[in-house]
């Protein structure tokens, strides 16, 4: 009996050990996500946890679209879901024409249908029943591949970092079988994109010829005009014009008053099929993001997505809605006296759109600026962004408003004497851009080596997304066409080019990217020439930050260069002398052509000076708002009075002291229009207004003919800094500033022989000041003048 009990005890222990080891973790196979990973088990019907391999597995091994499918995931030690105790969900879709279709839930949406059952520690399972097709409700769409991601409930953890895929057999529905290519020359005058020539017909064309001269095996068009139906006939099949490198088709009998939606369908017979929107679309429909745009910003009735669309869809209308411009001949008066307000629509008003910004135009006029630089407004991925992630360059982003709203905003600006400058991003494009999708290395999730527009890897160290090759004639033609379109269609007054240092094909590092590059210079001059062919008065500004030799050559050609004074003005604003010299923002310092620099204290990209003063200020600047705003005003007096174009970042005039890192660097920032109700912040805004209006009313003081002298290096920290300006008609300014924490007696004396002396800001007439030093309070300044403005 004792022996029998011992045997029974050993059997129980063995069973316990076997059960516990069945879901223990083995070495993680990194290859498990490449058509992951199937099942080695000969017992195909047993899905108990005892038989599960690590990683993603499924039963049956060779699933049929009209049968049930069970998907299991066992987290290896290296998986982020290993040891995770919360709910686990499957994010899945049918891979159709290169996109995930019939996805049951958004990434951050947890629904019961997608919740996996926990089988044991680190083991989860889900069954797609009664069949794969019915579970996805995919209708008559052929199912040949599923995309799979196993995630935590908040989406922050993935079981496998890369997307996984399961091949499926579909015996009921088959993918469309394209016909052989028909070669035919495009109609004369046809260009890439949507060719509307009047009447009721439109010719569509898109370029497809890779670096090696190869092209896809077929191309079709789908749209409202053919009921989104693929057919091997003239309603859908596109012709091939190999001499032009294009697929094309003419669609006839269209209603000129109707807006149509369409896509291209192209691919290779033995490879992936993709849907493309037209790269030259002036309006797109985005099924993932349009639904979140408020009705007041863009009417939902104008964003109806087609049932049979997949991914981003293009639209067109033969009889376009014409905007009636009130201002057709606006011109920038003086490009060397631009006073630019850099504005981000999302963070400028509570509505985060064009209409909100339009309601503040009178405020901006009152402030005294004469130009607005809009951060990128061409279609970008998502709705909530700085905009430096462009995907469609000819379409304005709907998150800010309709096409007419953009035009009205520009028209209203022109009515008020304000120029409008678009911030444009041609260094790169996102993977949603048709040029990126057309030649895409899905295995490595990057640009394909045969892509004729993009570099596989950027030659410079500042790459984001997909890097345009600006020495490609295809790229240069595209960019020049887009620049001309924006000037003609929206009547804007110029451009600020983002990251032009990246317009290089020279392999370089952080230490060499700024070196002189004659090819980069040639590209930028070519773009400048194209702009001036369309509008000879347009201003062209570069975010370049290259060597002086290169920047001077570009400035001598007529372009203007961003000049970053943020560090120096943050230092002076905080009351610290080290690194606080202002000399670099003035063209006279290094022989730059007058007006060649657009200098700034702040930009969208830099930390806010008032925040730095609040956080790191010397003495009581951290706690004393009155002194902090005085320090910001002293900065302003020694910035806006320097000749040459200037740029202000939005709300700098209010002493906005929320960090750029608040809610993430590019994240939404809080509004503080109530700042203007505070006496100290209002006084700062008034200082901006006084000097900006001076620059507009007396431009000769800030012209190349005026005499300008200043002492603003670190060596003038003690004893006050000063600026002297005299116009050719005898108007004079003398500015003295104390950036320290102690009262200072200026080392420079007030000039003699002016006749009359005024405190320009207070308008008080002064006596007995000529030839004398000035006592200046901490963080304060005074502007002496021999005149007053009306």
Named regions from a protein language model:
Residues 16-58:
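Bacterial Sec-dependent N-terminal signal peptides
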Residues 59-75, 196-203:
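Contiguous beta-strand segments within globular domains
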Residues 82-140, 155-163, 205-257, 267-289:
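Aromatic-rich carbohydrate-binding modules that target alpha-glucans
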Residues 158-174:
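Short beta-strand elements
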Residues 173-219, 275-336:
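Basic K/R-rich, polyanion-interacting modules in nucleoproteins and related proteins
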Residues 281-285, 289, 321-322, 326-338, ...:
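Substrate-binding/active-site clefts of carbohydrate-active enzymes
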Residues 378-379, 384-389, 499-601, 638-641, ...:
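Active-site-proximal helices and loops of the catalytic beta/alpha 8
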Residues 769-790:
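C-terminal beta-strand-rich structural cap/linker in extracellular carbohydrate-active enzymes
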């Amino acid at each position: 009996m004792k022996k029998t009990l011992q045997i029974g005890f050993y059997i129980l222990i063995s069973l316990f050990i076997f059960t516990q080891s069945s879901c223990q973790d083995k070495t993680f196979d990194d290859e498990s996500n490449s058509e992951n990973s199937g099942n080695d088990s000969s017992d195909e019907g047993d899905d108990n946890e005892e038989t599960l391999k690590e990683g993603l597995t499924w039963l049956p091994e060779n699933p049929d679209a009209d049968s049930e499918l069970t998907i299991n995931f066992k987290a290896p030690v290296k998986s982020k879901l290993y040891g995770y105790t919360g709910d686990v969900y499957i994010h899945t879709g049918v891979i159709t024409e290169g996109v995930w279709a019939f996805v049951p839930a958004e990434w951050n949406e947890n629904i019961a249908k997608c919740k996996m059952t926990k089988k044991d520690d680190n083991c989860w399972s889900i069954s797609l029943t009664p069949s794969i097709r019915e579970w996805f409700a995919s209708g008559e769409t052929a199912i040949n591949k599923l995309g799979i991601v196993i995630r935590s409930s908040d989406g922050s953890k993935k079981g496998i970092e890369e997307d996984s895929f399961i091949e499926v057999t579909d015996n009921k529905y088959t993918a469309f079988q394209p016909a052989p290519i028909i070669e035919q020359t495009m109609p004369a005058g046809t260009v890439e994109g949507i060719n509307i020539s009047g009447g009721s017909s439109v010719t569509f064309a898109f370029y497809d010829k890779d670096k090696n001269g190869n092209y896809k095996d077929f191309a079709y068009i789908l749209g409202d005009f053919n009921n989104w139906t693929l057919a091997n006939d003239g309603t859908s099949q596109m012709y091939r014009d190999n001499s032009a490198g294009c697929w094309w088709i003419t669609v006839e009998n269209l209603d000129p008053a109707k807006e149509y939606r369409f896509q291209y369908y192209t691919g290779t017979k033995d490879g992936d099929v993709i849907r493309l929107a037209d790269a030259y679309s002036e309006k797109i429909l985005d099924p993932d993001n349009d639904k979140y745009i408020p009705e007041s910003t863009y009417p939902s009735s104008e964003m109806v997505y087609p049932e049979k669309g997949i991914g981003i869809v293009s639209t067109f209308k033969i009889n376009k809605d014409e905007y009636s411009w009130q201002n057709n001949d606006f011109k920038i008066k003086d490009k060397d006296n631009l006073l630019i307000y850099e504005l981000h629509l999302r963070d400028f008003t509570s509505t985060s759109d064009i209409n909100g910004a339009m309601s503040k135009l009178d405020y901006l006029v009152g402030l005294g600026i004469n130009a607005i630089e809009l951060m990128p407004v061409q279609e970008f991925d998502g709705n909530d962004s700085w905009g430096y992630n462009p995907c469609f360059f000819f379409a304005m982003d709907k998150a800010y408003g309709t096409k007419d709203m953009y035009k009205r905003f520009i028209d209203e600006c022109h009515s008020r004497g304000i120029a409008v400058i678009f911030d444009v991003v041609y260094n790169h494009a996102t993977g949603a851009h048709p040029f990126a999708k057309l030649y895409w290395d899905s295995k490595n999730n990057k640009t394909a080596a045969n892509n004729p527009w993009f570099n596989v890897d950027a030659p410079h160290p500042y790459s984001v997304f997909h890097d345009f090759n600006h020495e490609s004639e295809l790229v240069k033609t595209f960019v020049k066409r887009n620049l001309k379109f924006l000037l003609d269609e929206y009547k804007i007054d110029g451009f600020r080019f983002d990251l032009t240092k990246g317009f290089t094909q020279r392999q370089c590092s952080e230490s060499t990217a700024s070196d002189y590059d004659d090819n980069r210079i040639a590209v930028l001059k070519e773009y400048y020439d194209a702009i001036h062919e369309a509008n000879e008065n347009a201003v062209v500004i570069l975010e370049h930050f290259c060597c002086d030799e290169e920047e001077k050559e570009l400035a001598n050609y007529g372009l203007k260069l961003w000049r970053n004074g943020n560090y120096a003005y943050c230092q002076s604003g905080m009351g610290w002398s080290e690194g606080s010299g202002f000399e670099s923002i003035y063209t006279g310092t290094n022989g730059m052509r007058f007006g060649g620099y657009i200098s700034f204290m702040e930009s969208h990209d830099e930390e806010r000076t008032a925040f730095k003063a609040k956080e790191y200020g010397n003495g009581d600047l951290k706690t004393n708002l009155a002194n902090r705003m005085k320090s910001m005003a002293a900065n302003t007096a020694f910035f806006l009075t320097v000749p040459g174009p200037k740029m202000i970042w939005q709300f700098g005039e209010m002493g906005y002291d929320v960090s750029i890192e608040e809610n993430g660097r590019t994240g939404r920032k809080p509004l503080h229009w109530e700042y203007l109700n505070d006496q100290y912040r209002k006084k700062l805004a008034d200082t901006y207004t006084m000097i900006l209006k001076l620059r507009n009313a007396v431009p000769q003081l800030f012209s190349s003919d005026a005499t300008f002298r200043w002492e603003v290096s670190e060596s003038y920290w003690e004893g006050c800094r000063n600026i002297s300006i005299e116009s050719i008609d005898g108007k004079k300014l003398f500015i003295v500033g104390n950036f320290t924490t102690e009262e200072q007696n200026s080392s420079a004396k007030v000039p003699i022989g002016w006749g009359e002396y005024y405190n320009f800001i207070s308008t008080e007439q002064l006596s007995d000041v000529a030839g004398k030093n000035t006592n200046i309070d901490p963080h304060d300044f005074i502007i002496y003048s021999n005149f007053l403005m009306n």
